[in-house]
Amino acid sequence: MAKLVHDVQKKQHRERSQLTSRSRYGFLEKHKDYVKRAQDFHRKQSTLKVLREKAKERNPDEYYHAMHSRKTDAKGLLISSRHGDEEDESLSMDQVKLLKTQDSNYVRTLRQIELKKLEKGAKQLMFKSSGNHTIFVDSREKMNEFTPEKFFNTTSEMVNRSENRLTKDQLAQDISNNRNASSIMPKESLDKKKLKKFKQVKQHLQRETQLKQVQQRMDAQRELLKKGSKKKIVDSSGKISFKWKKQRKR
């Protein structure tokens, strides 16, 4: 007959941490740490094995265009540059500052161009006001007898135009110069033209704002390369700024 054993909760034997008295020996590795280290080691070994197989199967006489810009040393190892060890790809701190200054000047030039276009478009952009043209008369009789065509000296077709309203003399002069009065640009066309200019001004404004942000970011990066103690500040919105320690200038 099988022996009956109570299936009760047994005590969990957990791995302990490094004792305080042995803390000078460093971190005490547990089993889960060993598993991670072993998996990483085997992953790297598998990658190296695949690379060795590819190198073994590669044809040494195979031609490829990169041969013109590369060569091997005495041990058969590839050198990334024609000049070998004579060429140093790393830049000094002064060279990095100079490059960032040149980039910032280029962005500043583009921003000035956008500002000029924005100012020019804003001067040309003048929409018609939504107000009414109020005319004052001396008496009620004159108000009843008032006719806008006679007051503005124009035709009934041109009365409703608050801008580009031509008088009868101007219309007669256009007709005498073999111009048709109907060739004058209508109000709807003028509004469409101004709306197009408004969209262009809006695009210039957006580009100028983007270039301004880029210029500020590049100026901040260039300032961070300089010496001096600084403190990184992050506000509630996540915006990052830096504050330098005050120094007395002589």
Swiss-Prot record:
It holds the Pfam family Utp11. GO terms for cellular component: nucleolus; nucleoplasm; small-subunit processome; sno(s)RNA-containing ribonucleoprotein complex. The keyword rRNA processing applies. GO terms for biological process: endonucleolytic cleavage in 5'-ETS of tricistronic rRNA transcript (SSU-rRNA, 5.8S rRNA, LSU-rRNA); endonucleolytic cleavage in ITS1 to separate SSU-rRNA from 5.8S rRNA and LSU-rRNA from tricistronic rRNA transcript (SSU-rRNA, 5.8S rRNA, LSU-rRNA); endonucleolytic cleavage to generate mature 5'-end of SSU-rRNA from (SSU-rRNA, 5.8S rRNA, LSU-rRNA); maturation of SSU-rRNA; rRNA processing; translation. The keyword Membrane does not apply. Residues 1-10 have a biased composition (Basic and acidic residues). Residues 1-23, 219-250 are annotated as: Disordered. It is found in: Nucleus, Nucleolus. Transmembrane segments: none annotated. Keywords: Nucleus, Ribonucleoprotein, Ribosome biogenesis, rRNA processing. Belongs to the UTP11 family. Involved in nucleolar processing of pre-18S ribosomal RNA. Component of the ribosomal small subunit (SSU) processome composed of at least 40 protein subunits and snoRNA U3. Interacts with snoRNA U3. Interacts with EBP2, FAF1, MPP10, RPS16A and RRP14. This is U3 small nucleolar RNA-associated protein 11.
